[in-house]
Amino acid sequence: MIHDLMLRWVVTGLFVLTAAECGLAIIAKRRPWTLIVNHGLHFAMAVAMAVMAWPWGARVPTTGPAVFFLLAAVWFGATAVVAVRGTATRGLYGYHGLMMLATAWMYAAMNPRLLPVRSCTEYATEPDGSMPAMDMTAMNMPPNSGSPIWFSAVNWIGTVGFAVAAVFWACRFVMERRQEATQSRLPGSIGQAMMAAGMAMLFFAMLFPV
């Protein structure tokens, strides 16, 4: 969860715009079923990340979404291996697989039974199967909160990695505008940039209270 109201709305806006782009791509014209699945998974991810930025997002179940996005990561990974050609395209699908995996990670981090990174005393204060919405310690875990080094390392990798990805996609969008290029198979470069920026902010919120 993000505590700063302005930043919370920024993150929400990024993911809502991305979800709108994916939704329009599904209904705008007929596409192969595999592309509909791709856009649908990105739509679901954008909605889930927008919800996660808000306090009431902690009240939603976490096990189901974690498993769902883990399977989504498997889908993109399998597609990259068996269904697409070209190194660049495979790399793109692999990137989206990692993004789905990162979403699954965030949901797992919210559930101490899926990802036990906190102390036993913290677990004892939580109700069965969920995390209290007002506290949401797992989503705002600063370095001094007792989380292991590997947990913080993963979140740092997510923060830096998606920040770099956001810059990459933003630059690519500018280049495409100059060349009048378009994207049709997956969210366009501006959508990719917004998703990556939102993910970087949420990963940062898992490292420091913002």
From Swiss-Prot:
Pfam entry (one): DUF5134
Compartment(s): Cell membrane
Transmembrane segments: 9-29, 35-55, 64-84, 91-111, 149-169, 190-210
Induction summary: Highly up-regulated during the early stages of invasion of the human blood-brain barrier.
Organism superkingdom: Bacteria
InterPro entries: DUF5134
Keywords of the record: Cell membrane, Membrane, Transmembrane, Transmembrane helix
Membrane-topology annotation of the record: Multi-pass membrane protein
GO annotations of cellular component type: plasma membrane
Protein name, as recorded: Uncharacterized protein Rv0970
Species this chain originates from: Mycobacterium tuberculosis (strain ATCC 25618 / H37Rv)
Taxonomic lineage: Bacteria, Bacillati, Actinomycetota, Actinomycetes, Mycobacteriales
